[in-house]
Amino acid sequence: MAKAELRKPKPKSNPLKAADITVIDYKDVALLRKFISDRGKIRARRVTGVTVQEQRKIAQAIKNAREVALLPYSGAGRG
């Protein structure tokens, strides 16, 4: 039997590098909403394509924005 060919995953482009964003601020709600699901959960970095350091900064900024009521803790809910 022939060995199955492995597909190489397509590398994700970093959305922060593409938009030339260097500073992640908790007051930039429009940017932070791109990294939150419709349920209000923080998206994983394998989904968003950011680096480990950027993911940490994004997560901290989202948590700070939630604390000062700029972002909700949860999404719209079930219905």
Curated annotation (Swiss-Prot):
Keywords, ordered alphabetically: Ribonucleoprotein, Ribosomal protein, RNA-binding, rRNA-binding
PROSITE patterns assigned: RIBOSOMAL_S18
Domain of life of the source: Bacteria
SUPFAM superfamilies, A to Z: Ribosomal protein S18
GO molecular function, one term: small ribosomal subunit rRNA binding
Gene Ontology BP annotations: translation
GO cellular component: cytosolic small ribosomal subunit
Parts of the chain that traverse the membrane: none
Coiled-coil stretches noted in the UniProt entry, renumbered to this chain: none
Family from the record: Belongs to the bacterial ribosomal protein bS18 family.
Purpose: Binds as a heterodimer with protein bS6 to the central domain of the 16S rRNA, where it helps stabilize the platform of the 30S subunit.
Subunit structure, interactors included: Part of the 30S ribosomal subunit. Forms a tight heterodimer with protein bS6.
Protein's recorded name: Small ribosomal subunit protein bS18
